[in-house]
Amino acid sequence: MALLPRALSSGGRPSWRRAARASRGFPLPLPFPAAATHALSRAMACRQEPQPQGPPPSAGAVVSYDYLVIGGGSGGLASARRAAELGARAAVVESHKLGGTCVNVGCVPKKVMWNTAVHSEFLHDHGDYGFSSCEGKFNWRVIKEKRDTYVSRLNTIYQNNLTKAHIEIIHGHAVFTSDTKPTIEVSGRKYTAPHILIATGGMPSSPHESQIPGASLGITSDGFFELEELPSRSVIVGAGYIAVEIAGILSALGSKTSLMIRHDKVLRSFDSMISTNCTEELENAGVEVLKFSQVKEVKKTSSGLEVSLVTAVPGRLPVMTTISDVDCLLWAIGRDPNSKGLSLNKLGIKTDDKGHIIVDEFQNTNVKGIYAVGDVCGKALLTPVAIAAGRKLAHRLFENKEDSKLDYNNIPTVVFSHPPIGTVGLTEDEAIHKYGKENVKIYSTSFTPMYHAVTKRKTKCVMKMVCAYEEEKVVGIHMQGLGCDEMLQGFAVAVKMGATKADFDNTVAIHPTSSEELVPLR
């Protein structure tokens, strides 16, 4: 496939939008002289740029675009906007609010609540730092109102960004049709494009009533953001990062919180050091971690929910217990892909047993011209991953960068636990499995951050560096402690670039910080 010519903008810079227009036969405007350009700018400033208008399609007509994106979440929006920048006529189909899980019921409102919880923790330390009368009364409704206002503002920003990029927003639910060429139908109207991206994300899983009687009395992480008051008594079910984060937030803000897990540790897919330390920190912070436990039944009573559970510690007889007066039972047991309502079978688009759309390394499905990115694919369920994959795809499709694809190796991730976790690369066990135990060297440390030098409340900071072969290439970094969420990004760049232990040793550390402990590890 031939690359588009590097057409120049009026300022002499390469413009892929101009190149794309030229390749489609659109005339390119000639560069204006500087004086004329300034005059035009002044004139344009006095009026709003008109939006492109066209005759409305008839009811039976099929509307065509260069790029159709199903899903207005982070990945879909990023891909659509990048495609538009490259000259494509794009449209986004969204049945709910723009921004997807991340903006509406995920990363963004979660981080606001985590920040709130951190304030609560620091309040307890103010006396140790010499401040008196530091006991503050928390009002859940105040932060909920401010949080929701912030989210609404982001929804508007996304809407404005699409409008400025001349990307059409199609409101409604998309389903594929049986037409000869890939086509979707939204609210009775059909749309088609040579390139269609599925970026519909995922949704929280919850058990069926047939599995756990009364399960529907609980909520999911989506429902967490609808709570009007801080629950007095909370039970969180799950051992993944969502369960850990919500349990930590509720506990820090004053809710009596139990975290029910099937095994003896949380975050079992993380490095063993992180899994062990995070479990301990939860317990130290006052979260009741119910290990080897599962919910058996949920009942509604006059004083709240009654949660019956069974605890089956290996080597012991199972024990049945009940937690009464529960205000909030929250299921955080995983996420399912939003793929069932798309009629994928009409085109024969393949999915796995859970409904995740199967794609190759270039985000292609098994059907030509149909692609998928983000949580609906079930791989690395992180907002920045969906954004990066969506943009890479746009460059491949509309800039003819045939090798443009996301490298899924060494993706950094953070858990907003208390204290936060940062991790990138292979765990110790993964490295041993990949390189052999004799070829793996581990460096680790554990210490109390300087912040806690004068506080009664203590949290640890633990760090681990995983290195491979004689050159000791750093293939993994894992840490939990104050500030680890912010310090990870720089270390992730080093890991991505292939840094060695010697590179870290040769770097002068910043003192006094927690991050300096990772540089000269022994």
Swiss-Prot record:
GO terms for cellular component: cytosol; mitochondrion. Transmembrane segments: none annotated. Disulfide bonds join 102-107. Its EC number is 1.8.1.7. Binds 1 FAD per subunit. It comes from the Eukaryota. GO terms for biological process: cell redox homeostasis; cellular response to oxidative stress; glutathione metabolic process. NADP(+) binds at residues 239, 242, 245, 262, 268, 334, 381, 414. The modification N6-acetyllysine is found at residue 97. Gene3D superfamilies: 3.30.390.30, FAD/NAD(P)-binding domain. GO terms for molecular function: flavin adenine dinucleotide binding; glutathione-disulfide reductase (NADPH) activity; NADP binding. Glutathione binds at residues 74, 81, 158, 391. FAD binds at residues 74-75, 94, 101-102, 110, 174, 375, 383, 511. The keyword Disulfide bond applies. The active site is at residue 511. Its cofactor is FAD. Residues 1-43 form a transit peptide. Catalyzes the reduction of glutathione disulfide (GSSG) to reduced glutathione (GSH). Constitutes the major mechanism to maintain a high GSH:GSSG ratio in the cytosol. PANTHER family: GLUTATHIONE REDUCTASE, GLUTATHIONE REDUCTASE, MITOCHONDRIAL. Homodimer; disulfide-linked. The active site is a redox-active disulfide bond. Belongs to the class-I pyridine nucleotide-disulfide oxidoreductase family. This is Glutathione reductase, mitochondrial. It comes from Callithrix jacchus. The lineage of its organism: Eukaryota, Metazoa, Chordata, Craniata, Vertebrata. The gene is GSR.
